[in-house]
């Protein structure tokens, strides 16, 4: 009971703070817009280890968006549909359905969307209640945006027209399945972005958000660094930037433009708050924040949990066969040498009687636990069909 009261008090405090801001905005003829974002979810639907699971992620986002229901939107920063057997077994569709239930307004294409062939991506797009954006993903034989991607979407929130322009990293060309990329090409984002920004402004859009799957980070003074910076140097007229790809928690500004990234696997939610002046016809104030779910009261979406139960049950019955017993934990480190990587490279080298075994370290995604090892444990370590 004490914990319940404490959790309720935290949410009430957040609610009162944002209501106060909204009232202040109304009194001064301002409009408040809240942009919430999740990126690099990688199909982590299930709650386990450090992953909160999408039922909790959905519950927390529902609570946050109640604070400004008419002025909030939820965006996906790419790499959402693949990366676990729970998602991959169904070609990403459980994630699409979950995002529909959560009310996502748009999702940008990340490099890992091409873990799937283009015909599967088209089925994902057909199942989604939101557009999959990718202004710089064009047809291999021309310059038209490739189907099923859209360059942008225009949304209405709190009386304002908001343009969401989607961009993906050029690293897709070297990181995605070459077979699945045959019918598309990835243009440098800065080559096409300004033209679309200008097009949106001509259509009367009042706020423009770059929804990107492009890496960002922060330096010593919290300045924005990373792949996104040279792109922003060549674009003007945007009001907010959502990033992804580098799996970091980022909250800062480039110039006076808020830039956000919310880690990975649903561990966090990004929020950009914009205050738009009706009189000045522009954004006059902006701030950003990353909410780590581990630091917020746990709120579960029970309807989401019920939707997932049969999916998890089917996966467990199919992939929980015990293959071996492991005597020690083999840890993983994506940024350096790791015990699990060393072990499996030895397995490859010895199995093929080779002198050297080479593997994409970024595709090794989990630790091998001690105790019984199942097929699902191995698929958590090597989740991508392309590797």
Language model regions located:
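Glycine-rich phosphate/diphosphate-binding loops and the adjacent beta-loop-alpha structural elements
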Residues: 319-339
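C-terminal catalytic subdomain
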Residues: 372-387
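Bacterial N-terminal signal peptides that target proteins for export
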Residues: 2-11
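Bacterial N-terminal signal peptides
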Residues: 11-20
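Acidic, metal/ion-coordinating pockets
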Residues: 25-309, 313, 335-351, 357-359
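Short glycine/threonine-rich loop-to-helix capping motif typified by GTGT followed
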Residues: 219-224, 369-375
